[in-house]
Amino acid sequence: MALDPEQQQPISSVSREFGKSSGEISPEREPLIKENHVPENYSVVAAILPFLFPALGGLLYGYEIGATSCATISLQSPSLSGISWYNLSSVDVGLVTSGSLYGALFGSIVAFTIADVIGRRKELILAALLYLVGALVTALAPTYSVLIIGRVIYGVSVGLAMHAAPMYIAETAPSPIRGQLVSLKEFFIVLGMVGGYGIGSLTVNVHSGWRYMYATSVPLAVIMGIGMWWLPASPRWLLLRVIQGKGNVENQREAAIKSLCCLRGPAFVDSAAEQVNEILAELTFVGEDKEVTFGELFQGKCLKALIIGGGLVLFQQITGQPSVLYYAPSILQTAGFSAAGDATRVSILLGLLKLIMTGVAVVVIDRLGRRPLLLGGVGGMVVSLFLLGSYYLFFSASPVVAVVALLLYVGCYQLSFGPIGWLMISEIFPLKLRGRGLSLAVLVNFGANALVTFAFSPLKELLGAGILFCGFGVICVLSLVFIFFIVPETKGLTLEEIEAKCL
């Protein structure tokens, strides 16, 4: 709603005092971005809940991946499925598996249109509601068609949660631990996968076990929804609305101060107002007072942010991650580590490895920085992919080569692309672009995931596994070049400093 002149006046005052209105950065303003920051006092305990409830969206996403791998087995059991339509074709099973992916693609498109209107908090509340509805519809499905509808609804919530959770965590976390907290969301995704595999292995031989697998999401969705209802709105989203002339200026500013006090704990109360003024100044300084149009998404620093964020999540998928994990059970079975009937236990083993390596990344990411982990981890992925390709081409009599390559790939991925891809897209976009830009990045992520997943089998038949994995290795080398020349280091910078210095 448009503001009257009295309401708009404080906006122009902020612009005159702290920044530019024409898009030109004057030299005398530079110290504002470089050094004159209010110390970020915060309570680690107070920072936990603003991370935990959004991260449950990632946990529910990961749980769905793990549980579905076991649910498809339960669904097709004549004696244990508890349904008359258990005789599913490969296409039917494929739709059960990929239904949430289609929903996530649609959810990313929805997020593009609503993110900056309703804000991160309300988007996460909506995601929790759809998680709840999707889980209930899936678990109680009387027919195959209803099951697919439930899977798609659940997928829409995945798209919304994977869009809003990184933004909310990045915008509310103190800068010194922002990298750790956003990366912990990836830890929660992997934790959810391990939980899904675990619940699945426990209920796969239970009558109607697939219903229990999907119903387990219900209490988690309720907790997420209640938690997000209790948490405040993102202070940076509130301040963006202030400088863009949306809503009552003083009310929004006071709400931002209260939000920061709630998010940072009692230690922050005395400096909250000063921190809000500093954020307002920096947002105006870097030109956030002008709302971005669709065309401007592909110009200037907005385009650079899209290239960095979109490129990272694209390489995250097209370097073979979905395919390698898909092929993992057969690799371990070939090596004699598991019988075919123990596929779920194999998945749990890999999930635990992913969990451990993600934990390592979380611990060191704000010490070592983003670029060293990306370059080192992706470098290890290059070695592992060529090693895996060589196994199928030259060393098929030595399955230990494949096992070493597989474990190296999983470990290096979780040190690099796994957590840092989501972290960088939550940091790199300017605030006025963050909602739409991150939705495009999430769309690229799920779209590339779908493309690689569906193209893997025909490409394997056409080229053979050895050449295919070597091809992924070549793409991985290209991603190293991209990271080295394009991706900036954001360690220790505030979100406003990232926009001013890196774009």
UniProtKB/Swiss-Prot annotation:
It is a multi-pass membrane protein. Belongs to the major facilitator superfamily. Sugar transporter (TC 2.A.1.1) family. GO terms for molecular function: transmembrane transporter activity. This is D-xylose-proton symporter-like 2. PROSITE patterns: MFS, SUGAR_TRANSPORT_1, SUGAR_TRANSPORT_2. InterPro entries: MFS_dom, MFS_sugar_transport-like, MFS_Sugar_Transporter, MFS_trans_sf, Sugar/inositol_transpt, Sugar_transporter_CS. Its main location: membrane. Residues 1-32 are annotated as: Disordered. The modification Phosphoserine is found at S26. Keywords: Acetylation, Membrane, Phosphoprotein, Sugar transport, Transmembrane, Transmembrane helix, Transport. The modification N-acetylalanine is found at A2. Residues 1-15 have a biased composition (Polar residues). It is found in: Membrane. One of its GO terms (cellular component) is plant-type vacuole. The keyword Transport applies. It comes from Arabidopsis thaliana (Mouse-ear cress). Pfam families: Sugar_tr. The chain crosses the membrane at residues 42-62, 99-119, 124-144, 146-166, 187-207, 213-233, 305-325, 346-366, 375-395, 400-420, 437-457, 467-487.
